[in-house]
Amino acid sequence: MEELPIACTLGAADMADRRDAWEALLRDAALERERLPHGARVRLRDAPGIAERARALIAAEGACCAFLAFDLGADDGALRLDVTGPDDARPIIDGLLTL
């Protein structure tokens, strides 16, 4: 399998807006965060609108950061968001999820 380059295609202004959207989601819904071997996991409150906001951000990230993989699921009454990528992407994942 070919490894994708670790590069984001967003410009500076769009990157700031995206960062703000992630920070707002995490501020509104994050219950706990943990590191995974190749990424991180965030448990989110399963409240109205949270899954939709997370899905929208996942879709947007997929368009600009193809080297990251996202998995959103349910786990013990909460949402579980896993973000994984190559080892060199760890600082990006940590920054995205403010670990």
Model-derived segments and spans:
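Amphipathic, hydrophobic secondary-structure cores in small proteins
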Residues: R55-G73
